[in-house]
Amino acid sequence: MAGFGNFTENGSEFVFTGTQTPRPMLNYIWNPRILSGVNHFGGGDGAYGARSAAYIDPEGRGRSSLFRGGNRYFYIRDAETGEFWNPGWYPVKRTLDRYSCTHGLGYTRLEGAYGGIAAGARVFVNAEDPVEIWTVTLTNESPREREIKVYSFVEFSLEGYARYSEYNSYVYCDYLAEDDIIVAHNHAQERPHEWFDGFAAASVKPTGYETGKRAFLGNYGDTDSPGSVVRGACSNSLAACEDMVGVLEHTFTLKPGEEVTYHTLWGAADGNETARELTRKLLAPGRIEDDFARLLAEKTAMTEDIAVQTPLAKVNHITNMWVKQQVLLCAEAGRATGKGFRDQLQDAWAVSAFLPGLAKEKIRETLKYQYKDGKCVRGWLPLDPHIYSDGPVWIAPTVNAYLKETGDYAFLQEQVPYLDEGAGTVWEHMLTAVRYSSGDLGEHSLVLAHDGDWNDSLNGIGTGGKGESVWTSIALYHALNETAELAREVIRDEGLARELLELAVRIKEAVNANGWDGDWYLAAYNDHGEKVGSHTEQEGSIYLNSQTWAVMSGLAEGERAGQCLQAVDNKLDSPYGPLTLSPPYTEYNASIGRLTGFVPGIWENGTPYCHGGTFKIVADCVAGRGNEAFDTYSKILPDSAANPSDHSGCEPYAFTNMYFGPANPRAGETAFAWVTGTAGWMFRAVTQYMLGFYPGYDSIRIRPCIPEDWEECSMKRVYRGDTYLLTIRNKNREQCGLKRLTIDGKEIAGDVFPIFGDGLTHTVEVDM
């Protein structure tokens, strides 16, 4: 386990007590107008505008990249000795007497001490303003009076658009002396909007400032020893046509035991007057602490309605706290490439359990990127018009899950525009999607792949218009069944339900006839009619997704379902989770896709790609394999016993997209965390598939699937205004199902009971 920190008792915070991590450990803070990453040193980047998890913007997002290169630090300087240091250790890297960094849900707090001076810095953003709000505290812990200077430093970027001329030709800084505000301007004509200015301000009057990076660092200086800090004085520079910074120097004389607190603001603006308005608004007495209290209350409300208690504290902490924050980030900020059609729908599926209003908003937003004929773009921000075969199949399960969570059936009749022309109800969007995919079939009566499927890097199988995806066909079978269920139970159209089920049967027959390879399902046929994911291939002979989805969708039945899972166990297992495929490719094959050109053991080429691994957990639960489900969960879990964060580099509180695979020299390491569909599926894997709380239209099904060594676990589940207290007892060391179900002290037959709808608390007791 990680040797550099630990969770607090309730898991809402992770406290770093050591600086020597494999890479900077990130937290994210955001609102609709700003997104910032804050690492355990206090550094990080920030951006203004349309939220996307990428900081370096390609053309088309209209975002301003506020802060450059992670350069956002506080320097503490002793006037007597000239020594200086950072509360977060980096970049000066002076050995501190005391250090900690606390990452919470939407905030970070640094605390450091050196030479009798303690310094703390807390950062968050409020609900509405494009400003990082830092609260700095200095304490004199020594027995004598001390003069201390604090230098708050941020480097402005102010980029994020296609440039046709030199950036530095348009940039300069103002210092608004009457308010002591630094404003960095970018007036380039190519800007898509006016919000490409940055500003720095504070609640106490500074004793100096710098706005030019060269002036602050010195001609050959760096962030580990900035010239202004070394000298102990700023030059009050005004930058023009050069790299810009916002540095405010504050000088304090502290008696023994004395403490001082002040606030620093770093944010975005569209000119001097906006910078003034934001500064005055946020620095009004009591405003910052009121905003912080609102943030804490918001996070409490988000986390308290679904809370699990399992034998493992880390599972509880991540499920109850951190994975919800991670899914929220994914839903609101998208991914590094923007907002993906499939990604946003899967995020909506997850958050519908604890933020149903956001789920509804995300479904609406995503459906606007569906064409009238039913196909969907890959994503937006910026618009990616590639047609991946899987877009349409995610609509039905997501909308269905939202309806089962909320009972908001009127949503089906809400009008949402199509991307190209016209509009349709949500229900019409769903029907159009499954009908499009059901008719978009190739030679083997399987769904045409086009630019790829869920596996983005299978982008060579169908570009010629003939390749077919076995996995998308299986996912279509699942989507058709979900749509048919809605048609029968909510729309009350039995004829339509039969039509959809007939389509599902045809797809199932085609997959079983043409997609079965003898011991497992193929991944695809390419444009040349060649099998992808076949035992006849030396590389990429088996793919994970077709096997897991065949089981979880019910397409594979009986012996064949068992063969799928056995193949996964025997051929795709690894210490870090199930592999996307095996063996990894070593030679590029354009008729399969870019993944064949990747170094073995990265991205989709033979890695424990965690998002795909979550499908395996669900498949295990559907098959009643509680031990195997939790084994896979444990391998994907960050900072696991087999792959601690000291090695993987993954934040101990956030799921990663993938671990490097066994064929890679970096096996078990991670490239990044936070922005991944893994989070939503891991949340659902625990709260729905493992602890077994399945929402329905007018009922609840209880079907736990847990490891046999869990003697007891429980969950609080607020659902449609009622509170259900679920307790699962497993004295018989079972893995799935139940022997007895008791509701409010009364034993009932079966595993389904009606939704109460009375707003009260009800006990649900399970004996396995």
Swiss-Prot record:
**SUPFAM superfamilies of this UniProt entry?**
Galactose mutarotase-like, Six-hairpin glycosidases
Q: Which GO biological-process labels does this protein carry?
A: carbohydrate metabolic process
User: Which InterPro entries does the record associate with it?
Assistant: 6-hairpin_glycosidase_sf (IPR008928), 6hp_glycosidase-like_sf (IPR012341), Gal_mutarotase_sf_dom (IPR011013), GH36_catalytic (IPR033432), GH94_Enzymes (IPR052047), Glyco_hydro_65_N_sf (IPR037018), Glyco_hydrolase_94 (IPR010383)
Q: How does activity depend on pH?
A: Optimum pH is 7.6 for phosphorolysis and 7.8 for the synthesis of solabiose.
Question: Top EC class per UniProt?
Answer: transferase
Under catalytic activity, the entry for this protein gives: solabiose + phosphate = D-galactose + alpha-D-glucose 1-phosphate
Q: What are the protein's GO molecular function terms? A: carbohydrate binding; glycosyltransferase activity
The active-site annotation reads: 456
Q: Which domain of life is it from?
A: Bacteria
One Pfam annotation reads Glyco_transf_36
What Enzyme Commission number(s) apply to this enzyme?
2.4.1.389
Q: Which UniProt keywords apply?
A: Carbohydrate metabolism, Glycosyltransferase, Transferase
- Note the biotech application: Is a promising biocatalyst for the efficient enzymatic synthesis of solabiose from sucrose and lactose, in combination with sucrose phosphorylase and beta-galactosidase.
The job of this chain, per UniProt, is described as: Catalyzes the reversible phosphorolysis of solabiose. Catalyzes the phosphorolysis and synthesis of solabiose through a sequential bi-bi mechanism involving the formation of a ternary complex. Is probably involved in the metabolism of solabiose released from solabiose-containing compounds.
Family the UniProt entry places it in: Belongs to the glycosyl hydrolase 94 family.
Would you tell me the protein name for this molecule?
A: Solabiose phosphorylase
Query: Organism source for this protein?
Result: Paenibacillus borealis
